[in-house]
Structures are given as structure tokens and as C-alpha cells.
Amino acid sequence: MNLRPDPTFHPTPRLAMEAPAETLAFTLMLSPDGSQPDGLAVIDVDPTSKSYGDIVHQVIMPEKGDEFHHFGWNACSSALSPLTGHAFLERRYLIIPGIRSSRIYVIDVKEPLKAKIHKIIEPEEVFAKTGYSRPHTIHCGPEGIYVSTLGGGGPDGTDGPPGIFIMDCETFEILGRYEMDRGKQDKHYDFWWNLPRDYMVSSEWGLP
């Protein structure tokens, strides 16, 4: 844990825009036919570098058929909310869900050129603790890591509605479902929030 807020946590969009440009970027590598594992690529995006535009490091996953889609950080500027108690977190881990397998990878990128797998959350744990499947999007929120899902329970993800679950942003344990009352919702897609006004807007799309 840091002794002061992570310098990449910006209280305002303007301060984020004024921050130094990134020199490395992360992108996902997919196996279109599922014959190879998916992976994470670290790309040099420093225009002054001799390796500009090149993949300078890779993390290849141990399983096939995950189908990576979206991914996100364990922590971000929302940790600065005075209601969280997480202001001294470090933006260090990438959370990568497999939308087909329901498996979740936690990648330690503190040293991007030595990025490595920190933890793997197997689909059985996701099913057992949330009743959801097919994790879709990762958002770092004030209370932890929010994960939107496209699938409910059952082998094909259609047994009950999907929704949102929360993971601990330090241990990466699954804490359970976010919703207390979903109303008439029977599908799910993504969401975003207005933290100062304390509300979230979520959307529906389709079942897997």
C-alpha cells in the first residue's frame, strides 16, 4: 500500500489531461478460433523510442477458450472518494475476464516489462459466489472492483438474470452480488455512475 495517493489518480478530468503521456500501453491478444490461449501484450507507445509500436512483453494465459473482451484496473481515481477508505491503493493490477469461459485473470503490471499472472479466479467460484456468468466489463469503483456480466446461472448462462458483482480490490476475493433490488430487469450489459450524485445507470443487451 502507498503512503500517499497513487499519482495516476486524478481528482478531475482536467488534471488527468495535463498528466504526462503514457509510454507503454496494454492490449489483449485473441485466438479467433480458440486454438491458442489468449494473452496480454505490452506495447511501446513512446514516439521517441526505437521500439515504438512494437510488442515489448507478452503474458500468455494457461488456458484456451477464454475469449478476452474488456478489461480494467483494480483501482482508479474513484478510490479518492472520501467514503471509500481506499485512497492509498495502487493502480497495479489488470483484471481480465474471459467472456466465454467465465474465468478471471489478475495480472500484476507494476513492472510492465515483467508483467505476470498474480491470481486466477476459476469460473466455478464466480458461479458459486454470484449466480452470474460471462463477466463482461471491469470498473474500478469506490467500494471495490465492479464486474458486469452477460450471463446468469446455469450451463448456458440463461438460468436467471445476469447483473453486477463486486470483488475486493486488494485480495481479489469475490464479495457477492451488488444488486439488492433489480426490479423487472432480466438482462444486463454495462453501467456507469455519477459518484458525486450517488447514482448508477445500467443497461440491458442480451443473453450469451
Residue ranges and their predicted role:
Residues H10-R14, Q36, E67-H69, E90, ...:
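Beta-rich catalytic cores
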Residues M29-P32, P97-G98, S148-G152, E204-W205:
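Beta-strand C-termini and the immediately following turn/loop, strongest in propeller blades
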